[in-house]
């Protein structure tokens, strides 16, 4: 099987997920607004936004990178950032106690879903690349 055409596919998927995360946190998955005062939900949103931008940059570089070792490193980086994104709201940074507010009802599940998808895509690509690396006699 010729993998030359499939190589940028994972990078494009990772980039699309990263863009979805950044746009989502800025639009429909916003944190709650308690009297306009920055609270822990706003800080969690900012942390997710920053991690989403890092994921976007790694994903774009992953599309154009030709070195196999660097691609594996970029996949690992995106997978780890995806795990971080999934854990930021509610696990690493506490959110509001009210489960009906947007931070708990929308932002947290959205970030968990996209973060897990980023981790799965990056980790899956890394695993496939490591399996191909372990089989030196087969076509890469």
Locate the predicted segments by residue.
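Loop-to-transmembrane helix junctions at the membrane interface
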Residues: 61-83
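Short, Lys/Arg-enriched, Gly/Pro-containing loop segments at transmembrane-helix junctions
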Residues: 133-140
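Hydrophobic alpha-helical transmembrane segments
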Residues: 49-59
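Alpha-helical membrane-associated segments of multi-pass integral membrane proteins
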Residues: 11, 99-130
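Cytosolic juxtamembrane helix and N-cap/initiation of the first transmembrane helix
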Residues: 1-20, 128, 140
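Interfacial non-cytosolic loop connecting adjacent transmembrane helices
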Residues: 30-45, 88-113
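C-terminal TM-helix exit segments that contain a strictly Trp-centered aromatic cap at the helix terminus
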Residues: 18-29, 80-96
């Amino acid at each position: 099987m010729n993998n030359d055409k499939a190589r940028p596919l994972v990078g494009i998927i990772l980039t699309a997920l990263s863009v979805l995360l950044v746009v989502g946190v800025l639009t429909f998955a916003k944190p709650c607004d308690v009297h306009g005062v920055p609270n822990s939900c706003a800080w969690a949103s900012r942390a997710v936004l920053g991690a989403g931008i890092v994921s976007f940059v790694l994903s774009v570089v992953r599309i154009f990178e030709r070195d196999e070792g660097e691609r594996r490193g970029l996949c690992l980086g995106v997978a780890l950032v995806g795990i971080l994104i999934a854990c930021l709201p509610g696990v690493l940074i506490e959110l509001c106690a009210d489960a009906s507010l947007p931070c708990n009802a929308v932002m947290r599940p959205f970030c968990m879903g996209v973060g897990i998808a980023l981790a799965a895509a990056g980790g899956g690509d890394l695993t496939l690349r490591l399996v191909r690396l372990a089989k030196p006699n087969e076509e890469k």
